[in-house]
């Protein structure tokens, strides 16, 4: 990772494309805040043992795209900025990319663009062993690991959420989409403040 001239934002990030696909990870799922609490959105995949992440295909035999779009509409239709981002996000899903890697990369680019973060993403050409690079964040956030890192980085600092009153306050550990739909262009300010 290379930092931008302001020494805060990365200007160049390597994105792992050569690792083996890991089940039960955030590679094909995320959480949004629905009216009854966190809801998992999952992209069904077709994969084999020891399959590289870049080779994992998306399974379109079920109507998961429509279900995902309906879940997003239901959860965020009253969010302040959802209507401004909805069509662009849905276009990514409607494009039905063949590979999970393609969908993930286009979603990351969408989030970078909408938050105003200028960053070059470069897919890796070979697998790099963990902890051999100084700024290796590949395995920090995982559903099966403690969230100490998120707390330490300040990523559980509250921002406005549509269902905060119903949930009894802020709900952490959600997709960056939750931040974007609720904070819109101010998302970058929230990210800078953590």
Task: Give residue ranges: language-model regions.
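Residues lining hydrophobic/aromatic ligand-binding pockets adjacent to catalytic sites
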Residues: 1-194
């Amino acid at each position: 990772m290379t930092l931008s001239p302001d020494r805060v934002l990365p200007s160049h990030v390597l994105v792992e494309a050569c690792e083996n696909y890991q089940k039960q990870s955030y590679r094909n799922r995320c959480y949004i805040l629905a009216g009854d609490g966190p809801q998992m959105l999952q992209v069904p995949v077709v994969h084999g043992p020891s399959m590289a992440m870049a080779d994992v295909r998306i399974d379109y035999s079920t109507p998961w795209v429509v279900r995902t779009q309906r879940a997003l509409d239901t959860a965020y239709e009253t969010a302040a900025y959802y209507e401004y981002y909805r069509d662009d996000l849905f276009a990514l899903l409607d494009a039905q990319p063949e590979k999970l890697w393609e969908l993930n990369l286009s979603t990351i680019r969408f989030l970078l663009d909408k938050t105003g973060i200028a960053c070059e993403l470069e897919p890796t050409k070979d697998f790099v062993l963990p902890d051999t690079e100084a700024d290796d964040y590949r395995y920090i956030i995982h559903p099966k690991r403690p969230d100490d890192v998120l707390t330490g980085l300040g990523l559980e600092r509250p921002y406005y959420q549509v269902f905060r009153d119903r949930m009894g306050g802020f709900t952490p550990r959600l997709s960056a989409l939750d931040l974007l739909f609720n904070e819109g262009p101010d998302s970058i300010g929230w990210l800078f403040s953590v």
